[in-house]
């Protein structure tokens, strides 16, 4: 059976069961509320129908498909034509032109965001027609924070869409006043400095230009409590608070993406009457002038260095050419927002940091990088699989996964030994003996990440995958040997002819030679073989035996030769005395291994032979003779060596730690089991049982009426007779009149509220909302909770009633609809917790995976994998063994297993929090729910984690509104959600540290309801599965994944282009590097062939939990952060200490000090807050104690650590004095600094 047929069949089963359950009436609606979208058009239409309910989903989806045939997929013109249809009333025949504009703009925005994010619903809050100064109508757009989810381009294009609708509707252009322009300037500046850093902050001149020329008003709702410092109370600006949505649209939208929009306008703007947007051309000139001016004022950019090197090019013709090697500029932006406890692994381009290497492994690419697993343990465990790092290039953020075929880290031990750490076992064994990490090892970055960033490549180090291709080219020129290179085939499958001839020519046995050719990472030549190959084929020396010559100066090279001449050679090893400190220092810089033996150090046989060979048997005279002619140490070595020596250092990349890896069950505040309100009666634990003991709950409930029992209830299905009930309404106007009347009687509003809640007032309740001017679905009720609990227990036939069943304080949805109490009881029994929409979710860091070995997975057998469709490995061999490499199917996922933590309730107890355990509990809950509440057969019947294999789950990323179908195929001890890059892209996310959530399929279909979603912006539609995608289309996922390279080999020309700093987009065309984007026409994405350049022994081999998570206090985290800085040579601990104090501790202390003077006060008993302490000193509401909300401890928590760092490390005098002054100020406020009278007089 075809892969997607299997998924469709499983999903169909789930829908059938869910529909039977929902039809019974226990849920807010009788239908499953997660519609299945068959294509992107349906997804978009389903999303917009959440606001425009009359929209015909099928008709709209068909229209989108027709327009795509005319203009192309995701073309902005499709959005413009959708606006035409909306304005003509062809989609919904609204009488109001504003409603037509609203429909058209939201639909167009939904289309270009692929119907995945909630930005068209929650980010674009409202459109209004307002009056210009001359009284003519113009269009105003109101944005809010969720517009961020659309991305900068879509946010900017939404303004273009709105202007197109404005012009078509005959509205006039916006006429900003001078005051409004100034307000935009100061508000964007305030947002950037006080709320959140903008990716791009336009200058005042840019803002003024844009506001004057954009034909619609970009407005917004307030998203922050902070007010603008000036230009308040403007007539057409409704708020004095900062409008985050507006700031994002102007700064990160139009200003940042102007070039992209202008390109489209010049292409087809006139055709659609948008030629007036050509003002963006003038804006781009202005932007360029301003940026050039700023660069000049700051002394200009530091240019990356260029070095001219003569290297042999093995192209059609083998010849030596001079190439200008272009190095990048150090970029220290990643250090600007450092957090205490999250270490810096290397400073910008610092020698010994991570060496940049091009390639992709099983679990890298799509913004994820690979490092050697030993590095994770040598860095005290701060790095774990899935840990985020922020760095210089190619992307701002990445997460790390293990790749064993990379260059390992190099360490200096306490006895002076310098060695490579080849394995995790070795790293753990020597961990306590390490004095310094000289080199962190490679970081593997996929070519696709450079392509996506539209970046220029940086020089690659000379590595095995480069060397072997030069070997191939030279061998074919020198002998009757042929190898068929193919970027889309692993070297193991390359067709080779004439191997016997080559074997005879080189004097290397045929079998050994084939191993070297086919397995360049694991079968490296010996030093003798390497020298023979280089001499006979004329290729550079193998990188395994090449020191990092560019790390030292020419003077140091001369010193090296002089010192080595003093050393002795014994048993083919160089021995030197420990007193030769200069020699040792140079060897450390060159990353040459040397080992302690008594008073001596020795260099192993291979490197001894290599050094003597490269340095022409330590020919000092020749070295001195060529000294002035050589440009650097590497050039000088090449003048001594009989064979060519290449640069194995390349470029180092600076990184710091970002967010730690994550894998845990989603829990709302209070960890409720059900969405049932228990008010104050539930106590601090919000416990239904505690409320039961009190006999009632006072909260707001939606009301229903049972015609059979002639009684009111809070459920759609009567808990007494089981019949469906009718919605009833409460007249707000009558309730207000009753309150006024009761107040005259009681003279106390508290008693009035109590009286109103204690009765359902017959005159206020109506069965039709047409009978009242202000109908509402809910009322404040003093509910007989005992009745509902007893009925729930009776229905479920529970004999052991749980002591803790947690509800919520109060419901937050529009009509205060509650979840059935039965569900809360069943979740409590199963030990699972509900999310705001009725589902149960498991959150995790998004980790990409394209290939795996069965042995990497827990809980799945070879037979089970075959059953799931994994029949052959990547080489075409039938699946028989656990070490075979398989290509992951696009919607299969791997979940965390075996995560152990201390219990919250009992610190001596260890509990599991992994997804395997979590979903076992969820499956048990769903089965109990089916059996006890819905009277249906259980579906999952899970006894052990292995039983979850093959089960359907839904994935949904934060801030999105569309879920994606996934299938569990196994578990690993990695803390993250491991899935195909296309699956992650289907949620409009990459894998740079983002997270996703996973829900068990049947739990979501049965228990999700839009009716439960909170009635506030960002919660009504965001992070909710409003629509479900079964089959992902490559063209309909985030286009970043289209740039992911899928080749097994980068061609030789690629490495030469990296030296030149060529643009990645040009290299793709020139070198024929295939990416997923080359397969956009492939309908079945499971058939796309995907390769990898670097194998790894196991995706599980590495640290699983970051030290950052294991350490409990900030002081501990900071101490270890500095301890690691002292251990890594590429980091200066003094700089780290200074950055931590300046960027984290001092701003935090100052902020809390400001907050202390403007704090509110809280009641310890009922949590009511007050702006000022009540005169009685007690809570007027309940008599509880009043306490601070900003405590002295909060202000001083980082002060001791800051002072300790300031004294221990060499930091700037200004920073140190600022800190000491802050310390004195705090002591003056809270005490601790005693002054004598003399001190006071002299102060």
UniProtKB/Swiss-Prot annotation:
Coiled coil: none annotated. It catalyses: DNA(n) + a 2'-deoxyribonucleoside 5'-triphosphate = DNA(n+1) + diphosphate; Exonucleolytic cleavage in the 3'- to 5'-direction to yield nucleoside 5'-phosphates. The keyword Nuclease applies. Keywords: DNA replication, DNA-binding, DNA-directed DNA polymerase, Exonuclease, Hydrolase, Multifunctional enzyme, Nuclease, Nucleotidyltransferase, Transferase. Pfam families: PolC_DP2_cat, PolC_DP2_central, PolC_DP2_N. GO terms for biological process: DNA catabolic process; DNA-templated DNA replication. One of its GO terms (molecular function) is DNA binding. Transmembrane segments: none annotated. Its EC number is 2.7.7.7, 3.1.11.1. NCBIfam families: polC, PRK04023.1. Belongs to the archaeal DNA polymerase II family. Heterodimer of a large subunit and a small subunit. PANTHER family: DNA POLYMERASE II LARGE SUBUNIT. This is DNA polymerase II large subunit.
């Amino acid at each position: 059976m075809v892969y997607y047929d299997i998924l469709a069949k499983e999903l169909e089963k789930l829908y059938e069961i869910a529909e039977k359950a929902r039809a019974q009436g226990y849920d807010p609606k009788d239908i499953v509320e997660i519609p299945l979208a068959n294509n992107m058009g349906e997804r978009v239409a389903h999303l917009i129908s959440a606001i425009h309910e009359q929209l015909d989903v099928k008709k709209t989806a068909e229209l989108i498909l027709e327009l795509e045939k005319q203009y192309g997929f995701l073309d902005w013109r499709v959005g413009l034509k959708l606006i035409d249809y909306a304005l003509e009333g062809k989609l919904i025949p609204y009488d109001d032109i504003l409603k037509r504009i609203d429909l058209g703009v939201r639909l167009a925005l939904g289309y270009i965001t692929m119907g995945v994010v909630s930005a068209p619903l929650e980010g674009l809050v409202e459109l209004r027609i307002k009056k210009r100064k001359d009284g003519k109508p113009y269009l105003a757009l109101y944005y809010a924070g969720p517009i961020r989810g659309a991305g900068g381009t879509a946010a900017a294009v939404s303004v273009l869409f709105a202007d197109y609708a404005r012009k078509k509707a005959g509205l006039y252009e916006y006429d900003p006043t001078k005051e409004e322009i100034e307000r935009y300037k100061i508000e964007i500046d305030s947002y950037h400095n006080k709320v959140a850093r903008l990716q791009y902050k336009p200058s005042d001149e840019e803002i003024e230009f844009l506001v004057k020329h954009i034909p619609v008003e970009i407005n917004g709702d307030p998203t922050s409590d902070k007010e603008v410092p000036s230009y308040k109370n403007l007539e057409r600006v409704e708020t004095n608070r900062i409008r985050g949505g507006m700031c994002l649209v102007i700064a990160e939208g139009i200003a940042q993406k102007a070039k992209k929009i202008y390109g489209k306008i010049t292409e087809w703007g006139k055709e659609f009457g948008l030629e007036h947007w050509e003002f963006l051309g003038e804006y781009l000139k202005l932007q360029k002038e301003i940026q050039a001016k700023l660069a000049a004022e700051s002394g200009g950019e530091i240019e990356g260095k260029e070095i001219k090197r003569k290297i042999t090019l093995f192209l059609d013709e083998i010849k030596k050419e001079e190439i200008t090697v272009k190095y990048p500029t150090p970029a220290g932006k990643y250090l600007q927002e450092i957090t205490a406890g999250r270490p810096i692994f290397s400073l910008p381009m610092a020698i010994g940091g991570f060496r940049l290497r091009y390639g992709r492994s099983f679990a890298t690419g799509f913004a994820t990088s690979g490092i050697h697993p030993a590095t994770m343990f040598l860095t005290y465990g701060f790095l774990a699989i899935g840990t985020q790092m922020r760095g210089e290039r190619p992307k701002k953020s990445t997460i790390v996964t293990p790749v064993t075929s990379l260059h390992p880290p190099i360490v200096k031990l306490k006895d002076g030994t310098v060695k490579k750490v080849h394995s995790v076992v070795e790293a753990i064994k020597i961990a306590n003996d390490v004095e310094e990490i000289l080199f962190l090892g490679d970081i593997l970055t996929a070519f696709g990440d450079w392509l996506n960033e539209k970046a220029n490549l940086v020089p690659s180090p000379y590595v095995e995958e480069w060397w072997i291709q030069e070997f191939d080219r030279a061998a074919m020129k020198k002998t009757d040997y042929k190898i068929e290179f193919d970027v889309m085939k692993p070297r193991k499958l390359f067709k080779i002819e004439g191997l016997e001839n080559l074997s005879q020519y080189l004097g290397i046995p045929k079998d050994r030679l084939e191993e070297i050719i086919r397995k360049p990472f694991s079968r490296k030549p010996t030093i003798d073989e390497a020298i023979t190959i280089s001499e006979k084929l004329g290729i550079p020396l193998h990188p395994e035996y090449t020191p990092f010559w560019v790390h030292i100066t020419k003077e140091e090279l001369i010193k090296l030769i002089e010192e080595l001449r003093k050393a002795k050679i014994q048993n083919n090893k160089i021995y030197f005395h420990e007193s030769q400190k200069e020699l040792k220092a140079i060897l450390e810089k060159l990353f040459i291994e040397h080992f302690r033996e008594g008073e001596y150090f020795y260099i192993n046989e291979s490197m001894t032979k290599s050094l003597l060979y490269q340095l022409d048997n330590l020919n000092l005279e020749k070295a001195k003779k060529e000294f002035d002619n050589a440009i650097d140490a590497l050039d000088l070595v090449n003048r001594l060596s009989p064979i060519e020596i290449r640069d194995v250092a390349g470029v180092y990349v600076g990184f710091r730690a970002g967010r730690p890896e994550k894998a845990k069950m989603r829990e709302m505040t209070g960890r409720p089991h059900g969405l049932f309100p228990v008010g104050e009666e539930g106590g601090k634990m919000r416990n239904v049982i505690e409320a039961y003991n009190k006999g009632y709950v006072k909260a707001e409930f939606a009301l229903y009426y049972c015609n059979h029992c002639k009684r009111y209830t809070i459920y759609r299905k009567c808990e007494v007779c089981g019949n469906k009930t009718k919605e009833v309404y409460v007249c707000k106007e009558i309730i207000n009149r009753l309150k006024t009347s009761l107040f005259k009687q009681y003279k106390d509003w508290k008693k009035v509220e109590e009286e109103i809640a204690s009765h359902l007032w017959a005159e206020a309740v109506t069965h039709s909302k047409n009978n009242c001017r202000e109908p509402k679905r809910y009322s404040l009720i003093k509910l007989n909770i005992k009745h509902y609990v007893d009925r729930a227990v009776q229905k479920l036939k529970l004999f052991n009633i749980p002591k803790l069943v947690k509800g919520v304080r109060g419901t937050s949805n529009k009509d205060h609809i509650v979840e059935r109490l039965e569900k809360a009881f069943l979740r409590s029994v199963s030990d699972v917790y509900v999310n705001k929409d009725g589902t149960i979710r498991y959150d995790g860091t998004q980790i990409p995976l394209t290939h795996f070995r069965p042995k990497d997975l827990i809980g799945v057998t070879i037979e089970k994998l075959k059953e799931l469709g994994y029949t052959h490995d990547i080489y075409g061999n039938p699946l028989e063994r656990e070490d075979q490499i398989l290509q992951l199917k696009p919607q299969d996922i791997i979940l965390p297993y075996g995560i152990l933590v201390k219990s919250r309730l009992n610190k001596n107890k260890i509990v599991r929090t992994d997804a395997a355990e979590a979903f076992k509990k969820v499956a048990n809950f769903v089965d109990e729910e089916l059996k006890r509440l819905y009277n249906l057969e259980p579906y999952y019947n899970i006894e052990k984690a292995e039983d979850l294999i093959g089960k359907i789950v839904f994935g949904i990323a934060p801030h999105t509104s569309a879920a994606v179908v996934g299938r569990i195929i196994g578990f690993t001890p990695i803390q993250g959600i491991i899935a195909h890059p296309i699956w992650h892209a289907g949620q409009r996310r990459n894998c740079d540290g983002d997270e996703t959530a996973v829900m068990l399929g049947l739990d979501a279909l049965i228990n999700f309801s839009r009716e439960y979603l909170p009635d506030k912006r960002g919660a009504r539609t965001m992070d909710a599965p409003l629509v479900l995608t079964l089959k992902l289309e490559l063209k309909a996922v985030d286009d970043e994944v289209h740039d992911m390279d899928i080749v097994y080999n980068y061609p030789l020309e690629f490495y030469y282009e990296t030296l030149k700093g060529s643009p990645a987009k040009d290299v793709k065309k020139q070198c024929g590097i295939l990416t997923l984007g080359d397969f956009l026409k492939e309908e079945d994405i499971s058939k796309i062939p995907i390769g990898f350049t670097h194998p790894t022994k196991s995706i599980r081999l590495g640290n699983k939990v970051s030290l950052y998570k294991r350490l409990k206090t900030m002081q501990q985290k900071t101490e270890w952060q500095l301890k690691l800085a002292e251990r890594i040579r590429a980091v200066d601990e003094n700089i780290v200490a200074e950055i931590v104090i300046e960027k984290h501790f001092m701003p935090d202390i100052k902020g809390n000090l400001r907050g202390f003077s403007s704090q509110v006060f809280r009641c310890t008993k009922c949590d009511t807050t007050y702006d000022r302490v009540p005169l009685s000193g007690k809570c007027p509401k309940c008599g509880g104690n009043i306490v601070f909300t900003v405590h002295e401890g909060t202000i001083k928590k980082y002060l001791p650590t800051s002072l300790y760092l300031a004294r221990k490390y060499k930091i700037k005098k200004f920073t140190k004095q600022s800190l000491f002054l802050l310390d004195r100020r705090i002591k003056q406020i809270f005490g601790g600094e005693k002054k004598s009278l003399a001190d006071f007089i002299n102060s």
